[in-house]
Amino acid sequence: MAKIRVISDLPVMDDSGNILHVQELAGNSNESKPTTGMANGSLYLETDTGLISVFDEDDGWGTPQ
């Protein structure tokens, strides 16, 4: 499974519809990683191509949906 590297400050929504910034998810890193305390343990990343990836705490990285 490929890791997803965030190369810009893309908008990220949790599954409650709250918009987060990449820095809040990955700190100073360029890689987006799952965080704890999110609703249902999942994050949804919408890229500039419109794809949505789901980050799950169990497998660590997301699969494009």
Regions found by a protein language model. Name each.
Residues A2-L43, T47-L51, D59-Q65:
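Extracellular/surface-exposed low-complexity repeats and stalk/linker segments enriched in Gly/Pro
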